[in-house]
Amino acid sequence: NGRRVAIEPEFAFQAKEAGLDMVYLQFDGTTNESNAHRHITNLFDVREVAIDNLAAAGIRITPVVTVINGVNNHQVGPIFDFCLAHHDKMGGPAFQPVSFTGRDEEVTDEARLRQRYTTSHLAHDLARYYDGRIDPYRDWYPLGSATALAALADHMKGPEADFGQLSCGCHPNCGAATMMVANAGTGQWATVMSFFDLE
């Protein structure tokens, strides 16, 4: 539907009127080349139009990135930069390292090993890209650990709040996350954990 939103801006407004307030948008890089491995026409330039049309309709975007080693892993930093620069239209990216299952039965073991990418790779690649500003050991934690923060935020809003915070009760090995805060005026950012002495 990203391509349709780019071609038909009114579709985004119709979706908003029907109650849609957030979408997941496949986002494998900040260039057409980094999106070309999907062999579809909804490349980066089309996604940019879709992002603008969704934002104009008041729909928030979560960019979803399938990271494949040797294909678009060099894009994880630029994707973060893009999301920060467009924070008024989208949230942080949801990186999903490639998983070879199901319909990927024809993938050879050599290709599987060559293209494998894990959340640990992601944490270290972002640390290198940002010269250590994101620490792979200090700043990353299991997704489910944010549930306590979500519960606290819900409690602070009180029982009259319209909608609660998102929480994830998944297995600790299911995924990892890092939280950042950014100054909308200056664009400066820091990881939340960098404000604390964890020692």
Mark where each language-model region is:
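Radical SAM enzyme [4Fe-4S]-AdoMet core and its adjacent flexible, acidic
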Residues: D52, A56-E199
